[in-house]
């Protein structure tokens, strides 16, 4: 487990701490696979967490509630996936990651980016849907090690994560649908520019209003 976290995600934890976390959440180690894990319905059900947010999308400060989700990106005959984390306090983008694969690594890389930027996250609620990435042992171990509480939308209820759904819709409208994208690298550049504009300019203007 330790070696798998280190190799795949660049995360290093003391083995005793990981053992305590896994015991607390009744987690069992998994083999690293090169394909998408085929979690059983029982495993997913055991790892699903309650909805702590309950559509209360307003907070009193930063790093109280983050929302996260994955959306697909289609341009030409190509497909990619965007994983994003936003802070519900002011809706700024904490971190994002684009990949050709919709896998656990995509979510873990996004989370690690966010944790590199924001160190004071103890007590934070991280809300998502019930996707296999968010019910994975790797995701639960990292969140638990940082004192982050996992919250999940009810199955088949995207409105429970509507701020994230809305943000992805806006990004697609203003990047994916308005440009002649020729490659994944081209699209990543567009997203980088748009997120920088969104965080620095659009949010500032919105908050002034």
Where in this protein do the model-derived segments appear?
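An active-site-proximal beta-strand-loop segment
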Residues: 59-94, 100-101
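Charged, gly/pro-enriched flexible loop segments at helix/strand junctions
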Residues: 195-209
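Short small-residue beta-strand/loop micro-motif enriched in glycine and branched aliphatics
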Residues: 90-96, 151-153, 177-178
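Basic, flexible linker segments flanking DNA-binding modules
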Residues: 1-61, 157
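Mobile genetic element proteins and their domesticated derivatives, centered on retroelements
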Residues: 1, 18, 22, 53, ...
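Active-site beta-loop-alpha junctions of metal-dependent nucleic acid enzymes
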Residues: 78, 97-119, 125, 135
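Short, polar/flexible loop-turn hinges at active-site or ligand-entry regions and domain interfaces
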Residues: 176-184
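RNase H-like two-metal-ion nuclease catalytic core shared by retroviral integrases
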Residues: 39-42, 128-130, 136-137, 150-172, ...
């Amino acid at each position: 487990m330790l070696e798998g976290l280190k190799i795949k995600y660049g995360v290093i934890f003391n083995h005793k701490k990981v053992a305590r976390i896994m015991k607390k959440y009744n987690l069992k180690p998994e083999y690293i696979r090169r394909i998408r894990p085929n979690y059983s319905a029982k495993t997913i059900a055991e790892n699903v967490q309650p909805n702590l947010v309950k559509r209360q999308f307003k907070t009193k400060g930063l790093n109280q509630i983050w929302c996260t989700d994955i959306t697909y990106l289609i341009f030409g005959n190509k497909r990619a996936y965007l994983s994003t984390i936003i802070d519900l306090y002011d809706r700024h983008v904490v971190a994002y990651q684009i990949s050709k694969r919709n896998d656990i690594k995509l979510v873990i890389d996004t989370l690690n980016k966010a944790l590199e930027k924001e160190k004071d996250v103890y007590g934070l609620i991280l809300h998502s849907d019930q996707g296999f990435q968010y019910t994975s042992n790797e995701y639960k171990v990292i969140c638990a090690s940082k004192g982050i509480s996992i919250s999940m939308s009810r199955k088949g209820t995207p409105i429970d994560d509507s701020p994230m759904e809305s943000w992805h819709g806006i990004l697609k409208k203003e990047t994916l649908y308005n440009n002649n994208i020729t490659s994944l690298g081209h699209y990543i550049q567009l997203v980088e520019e748009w997120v920088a504009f969104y965080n620095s300019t659009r949010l500032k203007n919105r908050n002034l209003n």
